[in-house]
C-alpha cells in the first residue's frame, strides 16, 4: 500500500529507543489516508467479511471518529443536540455527508487488526502468549458512551450523575477523581450484560489472556458527584458481583481472565475472586 519513500521521507522526530508519540500522532494521518485510499480502491478479499464481523461496533466507531474530526476534536457533549442525542435522521444525514471519512476510519481498523493478528500469530508460534489489559471504565468522550448512553448513569441531558474514582487514603488526602462515567448496572442486568459480553468476546479474539484492571469495582465501586473537584464526597455502591461473570460464562464459557489483586481486599472482593 505504501512505498518506503512515502514514509521514510517523513521526520517522525524519534530517535532509537525514544518515540515522539505527539509527532507520530500528528504526522501519521497523511500516510494513513494514502494507504487507505489504495486499500479502498481495491479492497482485499476478506475486507467485506471484516466489516460484517465487526458490525456491532465498527460503524458507530467510524462515524464517531468522522464527527470528531468534523468538530475539531471537541467532546461529543459539545456537538449539536441532534447529534448528541443520536436522532435517526441526523445520523443518516451525517453518514451520507461523511461517507468518505467513515470509509477511511473503517479501513484504518482493518489495517490495524490485520497487522495485530499477524503479530499475535508470530508471538504464539514462538510460544509467547499476549496478555491484554481491560480497563473497567471507559472515557466520557468515547464512542461507547455516545452510542450506548442507556448503559451508563447519565441524566436526562446525557450528563453523568456520578463518576468513578477512589476515596481518600494514605496516598491522597482528597482521593482520586478519575472522572469516568459509571455503568448503570441495573440496566445492564436487564439485558443480560450484553455490552460486557460483547466487549469480553471481542477482546478474547485478540488476546490470549485478559487482565481486568480495577476488578474490585465489580464487587463495589466508588461514586463521586459529577462536577466535584475532589473525591472526598464520594460513596461506595454495590457492583454487579458474580451475576456479571455468570452471564459471561453462559455466553462465552470460561475465558482466561486475570483479576487485578490490590493486595488489601475486602471480603466482598475476595469472595468474587
Which residue ranges define each predicted feature?
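Conserved, well-ordered alpha-helix/loop/beta-strand core segments that scaffold catalytic motifs
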Residues: 105-138
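Alpha-amylase-like alpha-glycosidases and glucanotransferases acting on alpha-linked glucans and related
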Residues: 1-113, 138-273
Amino acid at each position: 500500500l505504501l512505498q518506503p519513500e512515502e514514509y521514510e521521507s517523513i521526520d517522525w522526530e524519534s530517535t532509537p529507543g525514544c518515540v515522539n508519540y505527539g509527532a507520530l500522532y500528528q504526522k501519521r494521518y497523511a500516510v494513513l489516508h494514502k494507504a487507505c485510499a489504495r486499500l479502498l480502491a481495491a479492497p482485499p478479499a476478506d475486507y467485506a467479511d471484516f466489516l460484517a464481523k465487526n458490525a456491532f461496533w465498527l460503524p458507530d466507531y467510524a462515524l464517531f471518529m468522522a464527527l470528531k474530526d468534523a468538530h475539531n476534536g471537541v467532546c461529543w457533549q459539545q456537538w449539536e443536540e441532534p447529534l448528541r442525542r443520536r436522532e435517526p435522521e441526523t445520523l443518516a444525514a451525517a453518514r451520507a455527508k461523511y461517507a468518505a471519512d467513515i470509509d477511511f476510519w473503517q479501513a484504518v481498523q482493518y489495517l490495524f487488526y490485520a497487522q495485530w493478528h499477524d503479530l499475535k500469530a508470530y508471538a504464539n508460534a514462538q510460544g509467547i502468549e499476549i496478555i491484554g489489559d481491560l480497563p473497567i471504565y471507559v472515557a466520557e468522550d468515547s464512542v461507547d458512551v455516545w452510542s450506548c448512553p442507556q448503559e451508563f448513569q447519565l441524566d436526562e441531558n446525557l450528563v453523568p450523575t456520578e463518576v468513578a474514582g477512589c476515596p481518600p487514603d494514605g496516598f491522597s488526602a482528597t482521593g482520586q477523581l478519575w472522572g469516568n462515567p459509571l455503568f448503570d448496572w441495573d440496566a445492564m442486568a436487564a439485558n443480560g450484560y450484553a455490552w460486557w459480553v460483547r466487549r469480553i468476546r471481542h477482546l478474547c479474539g485478540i488476546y490470549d489472556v485478559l487482565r481486568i484492571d480495577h476488578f474490585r469495582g465489580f464487587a463495589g465501586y466508588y461514586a463521586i458527584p459529577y462536577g466535584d473537584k475532589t473525591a472526598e464526597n464520594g460513596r461506595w455502591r454495590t457492583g454487579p458481583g458474580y451475576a456479571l461473570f455468570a452471564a459471561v460464562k453462559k455466553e462465552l464459557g470460561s475465558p482466561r481472565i486475570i483479576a487485578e489483586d490490590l493486595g488489601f481486599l475486602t471480603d466482598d472482593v475476595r469472595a468474587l475472586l
